[in-house]
Amino acid sequence: MFLNAEFFFFFFQISISYIRLSQVSMFVRRLHKFSYNPNYKFKCGLEIHTQLKTKYKLFSLSPTSYNEPPNTKLSYFDVGLPGTQPLLNPEALLLALKASVALNCEIQSHSSFDRKHYFYADQPLGYQITQHYYPLAKNGYVQLNKFDDVPDKVITLEQVQLEQDTGKTVNYDDRINVDLNRANTPLIEVVTKPDFENIDQVQAFVRKYQLLVRHLDICTGDLETGAIRVDANISVNDNPRVEIKNLGSSGEIVDALKYEYNRQVTLLQNNETIVQETRGWNGTGTESLRKKENAVDYRYVPDSELPVIRLDSHIQEQLENTLDELPDSVLDRLTKEPYNLQLAHARNLLFQPEVLNYYENIFGRIRDANKWFFHELLAAFAKSDVQFQVDIVSTNMLVDIVSAVEKNEISLTGARIILKHIIRNKSFSTLPHLIKELDIGKPEASAELDDTINEICQQIINTNADVVEKIARGHANALQVLIGQAMKATKGKVHAKEFRSKFMELLNQ
């Protein structure tokens, strides 16, 4: 069930304005032609709100919930019932500390919580618990580099603070309903300094941040679901900054920044004043939401119900020593000896930790591991229209298949047949059993085998006169067509090189 916003003693009325198709077209064309004016300097900082992957909420024992029916995962504290008190979730604190260390921040030995006062339907307490005065971590940085497709650039961070999320409002024609399942979900807010000099850097930073929190299993990293929400503060020529709230996708971030830069440049060119304010993105432009508040407006006060967080002086070192290998380090390692992967392949592995573990498990156990993994195994899954799963073809099975090919027990075609069979049938049979079942073992050398190979090749030549003619005209690659038919006829039992030798012998007679 939803809680009607009237429960919170105020009523919203929403007016929806429809945008004509011609207006949308003009907007798209304007953004497509976007360019920076050298006389107007772009400056931007970000505030990134990140939902932490915890079992319970930040200050209560309610489970974190994103897809449950409205208002079904709540505690008395989540709905602001008088007399209830917060209790800090240590799992959320640990994830926030891991993120802070990964962002090269200085963990503070003492941090505390404050109340940020404002009244809105999705905030039943009448305030948000955050860390305004003494945040968890300060003075971090993120290094943008070649792995981010932008020139090297250091983005400095002011702080990382732990805070609670709000509920969610759901709009109807004549009312706003409130779902408090999300209320009190643990967040970290990462605040950068205004170091971004162009939108490419902003895009690269957000991508890198998403990858980092996913890789460390701190957050799902999804913008579209609200797991990460971005506020951008943009100014031109050091004029008052404008905040754009709740940008929910990479496309929105880019389009909103382009639009707002153009808007501010136009104001300055017309000798108009830029007002410090908060604006929202409506899909085609930014619109004013409210005059920009400052700390006085929010009446920050320390939260007397939560104790100060005191951390051991060695906590930073301990976390650094136990933190998983960070994405840049993984990419650097995979693109160098002995792996020598292309950056695109390395990125794909990094996005899928289980697949990366599989790849590293077989590397060193298989000659030409890159060829077998990317061009044979993954190709077999793709051709079977099955998503790669590490438990379908075990690492040991792949090693055994490659070994059988190298020992001439089966051909490469036979290996492909086995892989396809395992993937499509989810077979867990042993390799010897599969070779026997599929009848793809290499036949013993004999005069009878030579005669059979000769007969197969001659028959294929006789029925493919057009291909033979192409070969005669110098199209050597056409020979692969004949070899392919021969391999198919023998179910891959005979190696392709034997058919190649026989075809060349017969065609040169």
From Swiss-Prot:
Molecular function per GO: ATP binding; glutaminyl-tRNA synthase (glutamine-hydrolyzing) activity
Source organism superkingdom: Eukaryota
SMART domains associated with the record: GatB_Yqey (SM00845)
Assembly notes: Subunit of the heterotrimeric GatFAB amidotransferase (AdT) complex, composed of A, B and F subunits.
BP GO terms, sorted: glutaminyl-tRNAGln biosynthesis via transamidation; mitochondrial translation
Catalytic activity: L-glutamyl-tRNA(Gln) + L-glutamine + ATP + H2O = L-glutaminyl-tRNA(Gln) + L-glutamate + ADP + phosphate + H(+)
Keyword line: ATP-binding, Ligase, Mitochondrion, Nucleotide-binding, Protein biosynthesis
Annotated family: Belongs to the GatB/GatE family. GatB subfamily.
UniProt miscellaneous comment: This protein may be expected to contain an N-terminal transit peptide but none has been predicted.
Protein's name according to its UniProt entry: Glutamyl-tRNA(Gln) amidotransferase subunit B, mitochondrial
Keyword hit for Iron: no
UniProt-annotated location(s): Mitochondrion
Entry keyword DNA-binding: no
Organism the protein comes from: Candida dubliniensis (strain CD36 / ATCC MYA-646 / CBS 7987 / NCPF 3949 / NRRL Y-17841) (Yeast)
